[in-house]
Design a protein with these regions (language model features):
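Second-shell residues forming the walls of enzyme active-site clefts
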Residues: 35-53, 146-156, 160-297
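Short glycine/serine-rich loop/turn segments
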Residues: 115-139, 166-185
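N-terminal beta-rich core of secreted/periplasmic extracellular enzymes
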Residues: 1-128, 137, 144, 153-154, ...
């Protein structure tokens, strides 16, 4: 069984140390960032190199939401406005969401990336932190669900697996979880009827990502990522039975060493630990504390990867033109 982890790497190509480490550690998958991106040809070489290092067709992930969170940028790739701006400006927001993500999927599949960390089902609230705000689809549950579904279906049509995030919801976070631990004191019934509702509606998606956030009504002592009660809630109350990965355990919302964070996440019940930085000390700590995937996690991974299919035919120039017609302010 592969190690229950998704790892980042340092640069545009693997170092000799990384090749040897990855061969031995055998993480389930990899994640790429702007530091790993230069050109389409370079990315194709890197994604092939990552898979060769572990000797299998390992998934390669990225955050390509469009807008601020976009690792592939011009001049080689298209630019997109923030998701919230598009939802507010488009003549047909849900169709625009599908077209946008079908174009993104085409760009990702072309360079060997087969998992995109989207859609976001967090609800926009009055106090939502600016780091998240314009990445969201809106404050209305049916709209967010429809936009999330359109995103996921478009990615799948383009040969890319979607990741539902951030379960069970960052919308009420008023601090940036990259820098501190958000805490929400809303009653359980409010959370169930609002924050958790979009995730329940999208619970059939193949992969999900946890939120580093404390809900006092769920577990006042631990963020969801390392809380057995929160993971139980995700599995049983929300009903998500897909492959469950953490958000980046390097974020400041979590405490302890990388080894302690990885171990606590696995102990809580997540399937996979995400470590993004690509630094040798962090990677070695994660590898020292992260076991092989469980039988249950392996089953979920097999079900998710079975949805990786060749892209459906698409007229890309026509889709580019359609998106410009749907969102004229962004053209």
């Amino acid at each position: 069984m592969p190690m229950a982890a998704i790892l980042g790497v340092e640069g545009l190509a693997l170092t000799d140390w990384e090749r040897g480490f990855l061969r031995e550690a055998d993480p389930w998958g990899f994640i790429l960032f702007a530091r790993n991106v230069d050109s389409p040809d370079q990315l194709r070489r890197l994604t092939a190199e990552l898979r060769h290092a572990v000797g299998r067709d390992a998934p390669v992930l990225i955050d390509q939401e469009g807008g601020r969170v976009q690792r592939l940028r011009p001049p080689h790739w298209r630019s997109y406005i923030p998701a919230l701006d598009q939802m507010e400006q488009a003549s047909h927001p849900v169709r625009a969401q599908w077209v946008r993500n079908r174009l993104i999927a085409g760009e990702l599949h072309d360079v060997g990336i087969d998992v995109n960390c989207a859609p976001l089902a967090d609800l926009l609230e009055a106090g939502t932190h600016p780091v998240l705000r314009n990445r969201l689809y809106g404050p209305d549950i049916p709209t967010v669900v429809a936009a999330g579904r359109a995103c996921a279906e478009a990615l799948l049509a383009g040969g890319v697996l979607p990741v539902l995030k951030h379960i069970p919801g960052y919308g009420q976070a008023v601090v940036d979880s990259h820098l501190a631990l958000p805490r929400v004191d809303a009653p359980r019934e409010v959370l169930a009827s609002r924050d958790f509702a979009p995730f329940r509606a999208l619970r059939d998606l193949p992969i999900g990502m946890t939120a580093h956030i404390v809900f006092d009504a769920v577990d006042p002592d631990r963020p969801c990522t390392t809380s057995p009660e929160a993971i139980r809630l995700i599995r049983e109350d929300i009903g998500f039975d897909g492959l469950l990965m953490t958000d980046d355990i390097g974020m400041e919302a979590l405490s302890g060493t990388m080894a302690q964070r990885a171990a606590a996440s696995i102990a809580a019940g997540v399937d996979l630990v995400l470590h993004c930085k690509g630094d040798r000390p962090g990677m070695e700590q994660v590898a020292s504390a992260t076991p092989a995937m469980t039988e249950a996690a392996t089953g979920r991974a097999i079900r998710a990867l079975a949805l990786r299919r060749p892209p459906e035919p698409a007229d890309i120039p026509a889709l580019v033109e359609e998106l410009a017609d749907l969102v004229p302010e962004a053209a």
